[in-house]
């Protein structure tokens, strides 16, 4: 993909992630070191009034995976997100993205969204990436 081939408004291919499972959350807790029981213990989730929720960083990682399937990781220069809603076990996440702006020096600015199957936005973010030019 070259900078010259990209237009503002272009969408990137959707990345469909499998349903979030409790086993996945336990494994992620071990891998990340985030053992907050809100992510793994039903009673704690109930006391908090939310039930078990996925780690925000897990959803952010999925969004980053989407971005890096579109732009090589070494070319991503900025990645910022805001968490919009909690993600719960049983939800499937879809990562979408589109080009918002083209800048000088082959830089594109894009939006990335993580949504569940009902279209609820769980995470919204902005990224910048550098693309190769046909003229280089």
In which residue ranges do the predicted regions lie?
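Hydrophobic alpha-helical context, especially transmembrane and signal-peptide helices
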Residues: 47, 52, 81, 110, ...
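Generic detection of short hydrophobic beta-strand segments and adjacent strand-loop junctions
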Residues: 14-20, 81, 127-129
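HotDog/MaoC-like acyl-thioester-processing domains
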Residues: 1-13, 86-136
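Hot-dog-fold acyl-thioester-processing enzymes
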Residues: 1-75, 136
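Mid-chain, well-packed structural core segment of small domains
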Residues: 67-95
